[in-house]
Each structure stands twice: as C-alpha cells, then as structure tokens.
Curated annotation (Swiss-Prot):
The gene is cfoI. This is Dehydratase cfoI. The keyword Hydrolase does not apply. Pfam families: Scytalone_dh. GO terms for molecular function: lyase activity.
Amino acid sequence: MTFDIYIPENLAFSDYIAVIQVARTWADAQDRKDPERFLATVAPEVTIDYSLLIPAWKSKVYTADEFVATWLAPDRVGLSVLATQHLLGMPYIKSATRDEIVVEFQEVASHGRRQDDDGAFGGKIGETADGRGWVEHRYVKIDGQWKIDLIKPSIIYMAGDWERVRRAEGAE
C-alpha cells in the first residue's frame, strides 16, 4: 500500500498565506486568552471535535461566540493559573478548493500551572503537561476571508498529568 502525497494545484499563494495567518492567530488567541483574536479566526458556526483527545468533550457545533466563551472559560484554557503555548508545525494540506481548505498541522500543546495565581505572563511554573500530535483545521471562505469551521486535534502522546495541571484554582 502506498501513500499518495496530495499536491494542491489550485491553491493560490495568497490563500495559503491567509490560512497560515489565521492558524497562527488561532493558536495565539488561546495562549493570550484573547476573545477578539479568537473571534477573528472562526466561522459563524464552528465544529470542535475533541473525541480523539478528550472523549468526554466529544464533537460539538458552536456559534463563534459560544465557542470563544466556552474555550476561554476557567474549565478550559481560561483558567488564570494555566499558561499555554500551542505551537503549530508544518502544515499538510489535505484538500483545497476555491471555498474550502483542509489542513493538518503538527502541534505541540504546552500547558503549565503557575505557582502564583495573578494570571500574568511569566512567573514560575510548578507543573506541566505537554501534548504532541496533530490538529486538523477546515477553513471556509466567508465574505472573502478564510475562517476555521472545524478544529479536530489528535494526540501521539501526553507528557505530564493534564488533569492535574488544569484543576480548578484552589484545588489540590
């Protein structure tokens, strides 16, 4: 059995750059806990499929506002003592049409629990949990702009205790 490498023949360089910019902004939005950046990246309706990573979260369709509120809540990346960095590696374009591009990125999702709880960047990290894997994004063109309408991570491995790192503030 062979693997056929997909080479998009109809992908304009400007669309490629736009998708990469949206992806980077999406990753930064999580790490900066920035709702405006998040809203700039997602379609009016976005599917989040965490079934391969955290099965209890399953796959769910959100409005853009619901997604941002959910993801920046204290039980997700909005926990003030949680420091994150989501690094996207080389993109693999799985399909490309005029109105839809599917990209799978290599991903390192680094999570650290601050020992101080002021929520400021920097500071001392006491516990960490880092995941390595891939994240698939589907981009759709809306009013001439590329937006993410599917986020589907998968994992190769996790180092550290993710559940412990993301526990509620004050919990031991």
